[in-house]
Design a protein with these regions (language model features):
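Soluble FAD-dependent oxygen oxidases
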Residues: 1-182
């Protein structure tokens, strides 16, 4: 199944192995340098199938920057354990997150690099649980409220009630906002 990826070209890095969470968090510290432009999408992926790999290879054949990357992170441990309503974290059933990162240097080229990441994310829709990692969603003006709701999954309505109780004036709104009322 991984042969198409390996035949596409040599990876800059290959971390196909179990690793501690802290190591995962530090993997890209050096590569994500100061002055670079970024656009990130992170759909939750149910399974890495041959069709999913083919989709990835097809879109990387059209990549707009050699700095761009895509990484599958396997979800395990606390991210998948426990009832869905225990935390705000949605889509516990998804097995992977696909971190799609378009990275480039010249701010004037932003539109085409962002478009590439969005197109890859959209092409991956058939393989997802219907949501994305909330920290990698844009704001409502960019994403639309439906995508933000999908990011929180089944927890959204409960989070709206909590927001209405603890932040009824929507003071904390500069994020992937949950308004205090629907």
């Amino acid at each position: 199944m991984l042969r198409p990826l390996r035949e596409f070209g040599p990876p800059l890095e290959d971390h196909l192995q179990p690793m501690p969470y802290t190591q995962v968090q530090q993997m890209f510290d050096e590569a994500w340098g100061i002055g670079r432009q970024y656009y990130v999408k992170a759909p939750w992926v149910q399974a890495i199938s041959s069709d999913a790999i083919d989709t990835l290879v097809t879109h990387f054949a059209k990549v707009t920057s050699p700095l761009s990357l895509a990484v599958f992170f396997q979800k395990s441990g606390a991210m998948r354990r426990g009832p869905h309503d225990q935390t705000a974290f949605g889509h516990r059933e998804a097995r992977y997150a696909l971190l799609i990162t378009s990275m480039w240097l010249d701010r004037k080229e932003s539109e085409r690099h962002i478009r590439w990441a969005r197109e890859l994310s959209e092409a991956f829709e058939p393989f997802t649980s219907g949501g994305e990692y909330v920290n990698d969603l844009g704001r409502e003006a960019e994403e639309g409220m439906a995508r933000i709701k999908a990011g929180y999954g089944a927890n959204y309505e409960r989070l709206v009630a909590l927001k209405a109780k603890y932040d009824p004036t929507n003071l904390f709104r500069h994020n992937q906002n949950i308004p205090p009322t629907v």
